[in-house]
Every structure is written in structure tokens, then in C-alpha cells.
Design a protein with these regions (language model features):
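Short, structured motif recognition centered on aromatic/hydrophobic residues
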Residues: 3-5, 10-14, 62-66
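Mid-chain, well-packed structural core segment of small domains
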Residues: 51-88
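A hydrophobic alpha-helical transmembrane-helix feature that marks the membrane cores
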Residues: 13, 55, 108-109
């Protein structure tokens, strides 16, 4: 699962396997280790008690909650993106969830074997 942070926006991109994990377990989590026992954890978790995608932050944890119904629909269909803006002090935070497509032009060092096939790729092509 990839996390992109830019300004007042968070974007998570999930591979096919991560979508399957969300279906089976209700969550997907990654972590980034830093020096001196500091680790940033980011998690996407299904929640039956919410009605909109919601992001929270506590010490070293970014958690994005997705409504259970929206999660099940997103995972089971060809829908690529879910988005929501939530109010935060001083403005809005835009949260985007996307299925991660393989690039049209392969990049060195990138394993995209579990990414979704790119919709603009030639027929029969993995990219």
C-alpha cells in the first residue's frame, strides 16, 4: 500500500492483494521504520459505524477508516477511486483511496506484479 501526502491531502493506493486482504480481514497496514525506535504506521480499516471516509492521526499512526458498505462495494467492483473531504482545523483534508495500476512504461526497481492492469495498456499486456 502506497501513501502519498501532499499539502492537505492523503492518498492510499492498494494492489490487488491488498484489496483482497481488506476483504478478508477488514484492514491493511504498512509501516515505515525511522531511527531510534520511531515507526510511522499507516492503516486502512473497515468500520461499520461511520458513514464517510475518515482520517485520524495519533502518535505515529495515520488511520483511514472506510465505511463497511463502501469498502465492500469498492473491493467487489471495477470502481477505481473513493474520495472524501473532511473538515479539519483551518480547512479541509482530502482523502483518496485508489486501486494501484501498473505503469504503462515499466520502471526499473518497481515490482508491479500485483498491481491492477492499466486500462490503457494494449490487450494481452500486463502493464
Amino acid at each position: 500500500m502506497k501513501l502519498r501526502i501532499k499539502g492537505s491531502s492523503l492518498r492510499l493506493r492498494l494492489t490487488q492483494g491488498e484489496i483482497q486482504q481488506l476483504v478478508e480481514t477488514g484492514e491493511v497496514q504498512e509501516q515505515v521504520p525511522f531511527a531510534a525506535n520511531a515507526t510511522l504506521v499507516y492503516r486502512l480499516r473497515r468500520d461499520s459505524k461511520i458513514s464517510d471516509i475518515t482520517a485520524t492521526y495519533t502518535v505515529n499512526l495515520i488511520e483511514i477508516l472506510i465505511p463497511e458498505r463502501a469498502s465492500r462495494e469498492w473491493c467487489a467492483t471495477d470502481r477505481v477511486t473513493l474520495e472524501h473531504s473532511q473538515r479539519v482545523p483551518g480547512g479541509e483534508l482530502r482523502v483518496t483511496l485508489e486501486k494501484d495500476f501498473a505503469c504503462l512504461a515499466p520502471r526499473a526497481g518497481e515490482d508491479e506484479s500485483d498491481n491492477f492492469p492499466h486500462p490503457q495498456a494494449p490487450p494481452g499486456s500486463r502493464e
